């Protein structure tokens, strides 16, 4: 099926590049042909052709634009898609055409009924006395090097079959007698298990924390949450009736599989933590509160307080599943929650501030607002050492350290302060025409791309008259017209792609500055 076609393969990229190149060449040839169909101008004629009245060049010019414009627009769409494909291959935000289709046009959640919570954990169901997991939780691991492993696993409890990626520290051996902690890492939307590991550079960062004694030996697990096309577009944290049982997948199947494959992993809640980015950050916090018998701590990076996607965002469920509400009203064992976002991330900054001072008896909620970074992989990667250091100090993370903590520190200055007042008009105008999210920049880019799009067929037509008056062979004229058409077409495609990217970035609130955007996207280009 076309929905299962991979969009991260080199074959797909080469196919897109070939189609785009063919479209550009054919469009340039069309533009040249339209220009060369015009007869030599007579005195008083401007850009006349042999098919119409020479006294009506404007009408004939419109016909040329209408003839070539669809081809130019197709090229712009193809170039935009090609650039997006190249970026996606590096960031691994979506893996198939079906995932992209679901993100663009998500289907509404058919149910607003929350299913029962899973009762299992790494050692098996809570009603099972034996800590030995069932044999059906075994899976075959593919060694990808540098401590990375991959498996496609079928969860017996959830019925979900999907990818899980696992990182093991240096010199890991199943029989080394070491008790390993487990950090479960959840990706956001869009995202994949591979993208979150690579974007956060998680292996080297966790290994460095282990080497420095900041955290005990730890295995990192990144399950895919794109368990079907619905979840790829509108992911859940919980088991929503009528949808895939993602909650059971994360809370029971993945932990049991990990403990089966890595028997040295701990089974107590102090040894297990969740962390996530964006929507995965909310899911990490939500799951830790709901299953505090399995997970003792969570890291919420650029997540939200009120659920805004998935089944929990339904009005019938969202109020009861807001994090601040769950922390104060939901019965749970004491947990630690590390919450972080950037001041310039308008999508979640207020949600982060709402969690200051939240928490029930025994909970520890630490809030940090980074001065900049937006909603980006660069920010999350930079903040991983801070999260790991925080996690390593939590009671129970190191076996035998269950003593109560001291009072939580005061939130960072940026987190404690309310949002800044609106800047003066000159500052806002400057930001509008220089900042990556500025409306002025996008307006100018949009107008320029429209003008270039229209100029693609018009300029060669005008240039044809100039070349005819200057003499020269027909072949030379055709080459000059082709070069002019190609330059204009490529410029129009580039400017249109940039304009679309700026609009998407503003809507998504991803990158607050040009430099942050280049840090994330530049390597892909």
Question: What does each model-found stretch correspond to?
Answer:
Residues 1-525:
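Non-catalytic cap/lid and distal C-terminal segments of serine-dependent acyl enzymes
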